[in-house]
Amino acid sequence: MEIIISNAAVNNGNRGCVALSLSSMYIIDKILNAKNIPHTFYLPQSGYDQKGEHMIRAGDVTLKFVSLMDITPLTVKHYIKNLIKYIAKWKEYQATKKVYKEADFILDIGQGDSFADIYGKRRFDWIFSQYRLGMKFKKTYCILPQTIGPFKEPTILKQACIGIDYAKCVMTRDRQSRDFVKRLLPNKAVSEIIDVAFFMPYKKKEFNSDSIHVGLNVSALLWYGGYTRNNQFGLKVDYPLLIHSVIDYFLAQANVKVHLIPHVVGGERHIENDYAVSYDLFEEYDHPNLVLSPLFLDPIAAKSYIAGMDFFMGARMHST
């Protein structure tokens, strides 16, 4: 069985997106192995520059997948810009097209919450490109559990409805998304399923029981006001002020340690890097009961660390 898992990143600093990709493969692999069905996973948006077979660990399971070339131009301008790359890597380009033509399923995880226009039209176009390929090659594709919407732009909403309606199976990870789809397409079957990251294996990290351990995820994207840096997501509060207030409150409590736990990590500063903002807060407070968590190398390490908390708060979905 040939399975394309689209909009699924594996080599990415957003540990939540990686958790979705890892968990999706982990669950499907487990089900198909139990039925003795041979299968191959293909990831066109894995994040790896080197195409071909890769392996990733999920607990005691080794998952194999093939990283593909991303062949979908978002616009004519984008196509022209990438034309030289397509010509230079013509064999790879044709090999990727062959995978799409022969695939049994396209399963789309949508990076969790990117099947929407809250991140802008370009992000939606990139996500929706896999829907277009599914329709172009007449493939059975399913929308894996994810957030769907919101959509502010009517033209984007119209495209989204076409894509959802064509899908063989539609799964959401929250009731709000399920109800949203039912309002858009009353006759479309849609299921509400828990987030696939709940199935990701982990090993609970043990902390000193003398303290109450409070985990806090600080979103860099919210800290800076979104990509536009002008309160893109319409928050009703001053987010940095709120974070300082939360930290101050818990540090004033007896026997409480506050752990700053990033969702997005990286070695360089950028607008989504939670670790950089957490590091700055850690340096600013210089408090013995404020802990900066490790820079997690994979989502399993992050989940294992979070599992050791007594109480947790987070802005990003997978942090919570």
Predicted regions and their residues:
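Active-site anion-handling motifs in enzyme catalytic cores
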Residues: 1-320
